């Protein structure tokens, strides 16, 4: 229950920031995908069925505020969660460096999938035009990943959750 409350609060704050930041920054592509960072953190460091449902719920919350296709972000965020879970178990590591790599690839995956599905694959030949913006957003989000991981680790300690070894 504490994990659910911690990440629900984190997702709420992340959603507010994701709504406000594009209006405050000079370019909207600099707005990081904070909810995706939380989903990666859940997948790597808090394995379980409840966390998969929580990742889906966070994606659905993103859909309600900014999704074109209802349920698409929920699906994509759940897939990123599962990828983070799988990779952390296969490589037996929950290091921050691996989290940064997963976040970088996760942002690229979700943005490209959103673009292709929302355009009904009609604009696939124009994908090369938006790739620079996607890569910039992925890099900026990846740069913020260690800070978000530290904040979630701090929150986990505050509420008394079990800590997983980061460099297993």
Segments (PLM) and residue ranges:
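Terminal, non-globular segments
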Residues: 1-168
């Amino acid at each position: 229950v504490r994990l659910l409350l911690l990440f629900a609060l984190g997702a709420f704050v992340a959603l507010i920031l994701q709504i406000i930041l594009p209006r405050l920054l000079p370019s909207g592509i600099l707005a990081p995908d904070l909810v995706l960072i939380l989903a990666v953190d859940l997948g790597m460091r808090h394995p379980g069925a409840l966390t998969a449902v929580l990742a889906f719920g966070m994606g659905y919350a993103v859909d309600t505020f900014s999704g074109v296709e209802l349920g698409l972000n929920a699906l994509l965020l759940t897939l990123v969660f599962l990828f983070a879970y799988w990779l952390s178990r296969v490589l037996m590591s929950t290091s921050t460096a691996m989290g940064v790599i997963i976040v970088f690839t996760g942002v690229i995956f979700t943005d490209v999938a959103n673009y292709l599905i929302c355009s009904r694959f009609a604009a696939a030949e124009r994908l090369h035009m938006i790739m620079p913006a996607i890569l910039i957003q992925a890099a900026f989000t990846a740069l913020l990943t260690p800070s978000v991981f530290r904040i979630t680790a701090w929150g986990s300690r505050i509420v008394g959750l079990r800590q997983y070894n980061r460099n297993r």
